[in-house]
Amino acid sequence: MKVLFNGRLMERSECAVDIEDRGYQFGDGVYEVIRIYNGILFTLDEHIARLYKSAAEIGIDLSFSEAELKSQLKELVDINQRRDGGLYLQVTRGKAPRKHQYGAGLTPQVTAYTFPIQKPEKEQQNGVSAITADDMRWLRCDIKSLNLLYNVMIKQKAQEASAFEAILIRDGLVTEGTSSNVYVAKQNVIYTHPVTTLILNGITRMKVLQLCEENGLNYEEKAVTKDELLNADEVFITSTTAEVIPVTSIDGQTIGSGAPGPLTKNVQTALQNSILSETAKTV
């Protein structure tokens, strides 16, 4: 399998990261995960724009253009003949002697590779369970940082509880999942946390809200309480790899009817239609 390493395509076995790379020692970097459908990188423009924004927020200057990077990623997908799956893209600040502060002139290290994804069809159709947990992450969740330690810890707790996701609560309000955005439906209105530094503005989130507007589905960007979450008619989550998944129980409590609801199904259908439309190759 070929990987992209600092602008070059090479075998994965040939790729070597320096032990003093700041991404390795500090998690000093940013990343994106992009879904591949029909050999096409879905919402590529939005992912790359967010990568550059995240990099700028932490002071990483990318010397290459967005167009150059997109071209390299498309070539990577083609050379690996990856028709369906995902692409992981990471940028670190670069290598330097280990100390917290960083000097000028570091060269960012860019890596990318493709991987298979098994579409969570059963979960999308039947729904999943979730737990809640205190949101104790740092206050710049809008940056897609490599620092995911708390997310990892809480996601592991969810797995140990036989749950698919953990929904995070800060000051009594629902923020997001450990690796997803969260939506609460009540009386035919879909609520989701507004775009602030407390959540990552997910690419699938952006697409879903666009599709809600186009399909006449009512939504409001408003934080809801934990009680409102537990007493919702419907709850669902979105992410690049999960797409749209209904949540039918939280902390052992049944949500709504205990089955995927009509609003969730409408959002699922709208997203699938958008994916098919945007990744259809013309002859």
From Swiss-Prot:
E.C. code: 2.6.1.21
Top EC class for this record: transferase
UniProt keyword terms in alphabetical order: Aminotransferase, Pyridoxal phosphate, Transferase
Binding site for substrate: 31, 98, 100
PROSITE patterns per UniProt: AA_TRANSFER_CLASS_4
Active-site residues (renumbered): 144
Reaction(s) catalysed (UniProt annotation): D-alanine + 2-oxoglutarate = D-glutamate + pyruvate
Cofactor: pyridoxal 5'-phosphate
UniProt GO molecular function: D-alanine-2-oxoglutarate aminotransferase activity; pyridoxal phosphate binding
A GO term from the CC aspect: cytosol
Positions that bind pyridoxal 5'-phosphate: 50, 176
Pfam name, any one: Aminotran_4
A biological process term (GO) from this entry: D-amino acid catabolic process
Complexes and interactors: Homodimer.
Known function: Acts on the D-isomers of alanine, leucine, aspartate, glutamate, aminobutyrate, norvaline and asparagine. The enzyme transfers an amino group from a substrate D-amino acid to the pyridoxal phosphate cofactor to form pyridoxamine and an alpha-keto acid in the first half-reaction. The second half-reaction is the reverse of the first, transferring the amino group from the pyridoxamine to a second alpha-keto acid to form the product D-amino acid via a ping-pong mechanism. This is an important process in the formation of D-alanine and D-glutamate, which are essential bacterial cell wall components.
Identification of the protein by name: D-alanine aminotransferase
Organism from which the protein derives: Bacillus licheniformis
Taxonomic lineage from the root: Bacteria, Bacillati, Bacillota, Bacilli, Bacillales
Gene name for this UniProt entry: dat
